[in-house]
Every structure is written in structure tokens, then in C-alpha cells.
Amino acid sequence: MKIETSRFGLLDIDDDKIITLPDAMPGFAETRFTLLNPEKHAPFCWLQSVDNPDLAFVMVDARQTLPDYAVSLTSDEYERLSLDEKSNTVVFLVVTLATDPADITVNLQGPIVLNPERMIAKQIVLEGSRFPSRHPLFGIAKGRETVETSCAG
């Protein structure tokens, strides 16, 4: 399938790389995306809409960035993602970019959970969570070294 993107131009994407979000992300109608990982943008990857060339979200793989971060899914979320007890998931965090790396944050309240076997994803809204919506990505605020990450998918 050929898709037009405003950032990367015309791309040829295999049909099996299309991710479906049965429940669109809050505020967006698009439900079909693909994961792009241009090496020059590492550690970031892009969740690119296949239907809207201008809609893409910058993300990082949570387990590479914050290994202790965990998301508990409800039985309804398991069902919506077509998961069972043997299924693997990949949890992505949406990134808010900034000119100064110290100001780059990730949204821990709204992770995107992907079932890579079925290519189904869902943004999980962790209401009342102890997690912030703007957590420093590189831990500079806590004096940690810069974290090197990569997107899996």
C-alpha cells in the first residue's frame, strides 16, 4: 500500500504493517496507522496515520526508556486488543518534543499498547493514575545519564 506523509514523502507499506486502533485515540478519528522508525530519528519512532498525511505521533518504546513502567489492562482492554494470557505487547509512550532535550517529555498517563501479532493497538488512558502526562524522557531533571532507546515493533 502506498501512503503519502508530510514528513517522509510517499512510502510503500506492506499491508501486514498496518496497525488498527479499533477505538480511535481521543480527539482523532483516524484508526489506521503504521510504525515508522527512520534511523536518523533514533531513539524516536513515528506512529503515522495511513489516511492523513499530516497526522503522526512521535513515540518511544516504554521498556527501553522506563523499564519499571507497567500498564495494567482491564478485561475489556484485553478483549479490544485481541490478547490472551500468552500474548506479547509493546507499550509505547507518546513524546512531546522540545528544542532543549531537557524539556522533552513522555506521556505516562496515555500509553499506546500494541498487540504485534494482530497489529491492533489502543491508547490506554490511565485516569487517576500516579503517572504524570509530562515525564522527562531523558531523566535530566533527576540527574540521570541520557537514556538510549530504540523502538521495537
Swiss-Prot record:
The subcellular location is: Cytoplasm
Q: Output one GO BP term.
A: bacterial-type flagellum assembly
Keyword Cytoplasm listed? The answer is yes
What Pfam families is this protein classified in?
FliW
- Report the record's disulfide bonds: none
Q: Gene3D superfamilies under this entry? A: BH3618-like (2.30.290.10)
The UniProt entry's sequence similarity note says:
Belongs to the FliW family.
Q: What is known about what this protein does?
A: Acts as an anti-CsrA protein, binds CsrA and prevents it from repressing translation of its target genes, one of which is flagellin. Binds to flagellin and participates in the assembly of the flagellum.
**What PANTHER family does the annotation carry?**
FLAGELLAR ASSEMBLY FACTOR FLIW
- The protein in question is named Flagellar assembly factor FliW
Q: Whose protein is this, by species? A: Geobacter metallireducens (strain ATCC 53774 / DSM 7210 / GS-15)
Q: What is the lineage of its organism?
A: Bacteria, Pseudomonadati, Thermodesulfobacteriota, Desulfuromonadia, Geobacterales
